[in-house]
């Protein structure tokens, strides 16, 4: 108990001082992306686009209000090439127990639709707009919809907040896709010449890269990263935090996990799944989306 109190105090002080929080010490292995959607178990499945991947897998908030619940939308990782909503199924069930409605968004990838990263972002923004337009019937508060994701899915979550110029051609642009907060798991936030995936998005990276589009009134953000991540560097996280502060005027809480690799937070790595979810709940409580 004394150790936990000490760790909590150190974490709070670090955040107040704008310092990275560093937690844990054991390595984890990367998430192995899966394209299988047949075993995603949700309370209901919605269609937001008329396509095989235009689906939203919804998990209802448990034991709280029957309407106007906060919602978190998760986007799976896989380099815009592969992946499945299944990746975040246990995170969805975890947050639902705290009165959060959770949505696992499917979207087009290279493997399932032969598309580019741009189409993935189009779908992500269409999903956010669909939820906002239909929030009342889904018992969601349209002013309390957050976005989350891992790796390329973290990029999509962040890009729904910052990247205004890429939209699905069928979107109602009068509906904002911008989430109220971001929960990012080793996210791809820099697609510039020194960032991830530049060769695939070079023709439109300035409209596609979250780092290059941060603006005032950015949503508060929590950012999880392993120090041994071979895709997202600690320096990238530092730059993102600094730009969120100086340009976005927003809170950005980075948590670094020593020795951890890309995908360390996934549910098969029980220790770090739990650690990141505990911090996620604390973040949501601090913003008033979860009550004690």
Question: What would you call each of these model-derived segments?
Answer:
Residues 29-65:
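N-terminal cap/lid segment of alpha/beta-hydrolase-fold proteins
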Residues 115-136, 278:
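Alpha/beta-hydrolase active-site loop
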Residues 86-104:
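Short amphipathic alpha-helix adjacent to the substrate-entry channel of hydrolases
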Residues 79-83, 87, 102, 130:
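Serine-hydrolase catalytic-loop signature spanning alpha/beta hydrolases and amidase-signature enzymes
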Residues 126-196, 205-206, 210:
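Primarily recognizes the serine-hydrolase "nucleophile elbow" in alpha/beta-hydrolase
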Residues 68-78:
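Short beta-strand element of the alpha/beta-hydrolase
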Residues 223-225, 229:
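Short beta-strand/loop motif that positions the catalytic acidic residue
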Residues 234, 238, 247-292:
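C-terminal catalytic histidine-bearing segment of alpha/beta-hydrolase fold enzymes
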